[in-house]
Amino acid sequence: MSALGYRTFKDRLFFWSVCFFASLTAIPLFLIIWEVVKKGYKQINLRFFVETAPSTLDAMLARNSGELIPGGIANGITGTLMMVAMASVIAIPVGILGGVYLAEKPKAVFTSVIRFLTDLVQGSPSIVIGIIAYSWVVKPLGSYSAIAGSTALAIMMLPLIIRSTEETLKMLPGSLKEAGLALGCSYTSVVIKVLIPSAFGGLFTGILLAISRVMGETAPLMLTALGSSAINWDVLQPTSAVPLLIWEFYNDPNLIDMIWSSSLFLLLLILVLNIIAKQVAKKWKTA
């Protein structure tokens, strides 16, 4: 074999080795998605989205008669959306302001403290965040509530938003800020009216990724929101969520089919959010 042929052989061997090991990581993911879709699509209908979780008796009677389990996860969907919305109201402004500070004051002593705390929170198990929210909100209020659940989710969203904001602002050319200051604008005006709008695509992507990250959390909500069998709009009362319903269905053999349909809904919701985030990031980079 000539030297050129040997190098070509090595290149092809390396290429196909990379493809093989990449497929090893992708195959389990596709198998999981296929399993969830195959077992979950049967329960997906209009009632699944507008009715609350079924009782054990109704599920048992339906299974014995060979019918679809009645009811749905409307209480979980409304609870998830409500708590994520409240968590976003808390985490988005705080996270953006924190990211702006880290990007604009990289050498400040307080910046190192914020970075350390951000990394610490991001690496903490979700159950620990739930315990913190329990001691901060549940115990003082005397009951589990949607506010407590949203507090736990907001804490988990903060590191992602702070980091994405910081990295996005660092990618902006320094001439933007210099031009604004040269025109006589105050530093605050430059940040609010120039830097943040210019970084909107990156900020929006980070926010969507943070939301998709917390939508599937169960452990912190078990210690804060607890769950509810009905649709509850009172933020001071226990509230359900889709991950909590999946856990409840798991503990009832008669509701096993609802696990797959609920998982499919949650999987598709998070997948859509991630696709939107990727598209926004792609358009922002090419703009």
List where the protein language model places each region.
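Transmembrane alpha-helical segments of polytopic membrane transport and secretion proteins
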Residues: 1-24, 277-287
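Periplasmic/extracellular loop-to-transmembrane helix junction in inner-membrane transport proteins
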Residues: 2-12, 16, 35-87, 107, ...
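Interhelical loop and adjacent transmembrane-helix boundary motif
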Residues: 60, 221-267
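Transmembrane-helix boundary motif in ABC transporter permease subunits
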Residues: 86-118, 278-286
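Generic hydrophobic transmembrane alpha-helix motif, especially the helices
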Residues: 119-155
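Glycine/proline-centered hinge or cleavage motifs at structural transition points of membrane proteins
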Residues: 125, 183-184, 197
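C-terminal transmembrane helix and the adjacent membrane-cytosol boundary/short C-terminal tail
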Residues: 166-170, 208, 248-287
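Transmembrane alpha-helices
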Residues: 187-223
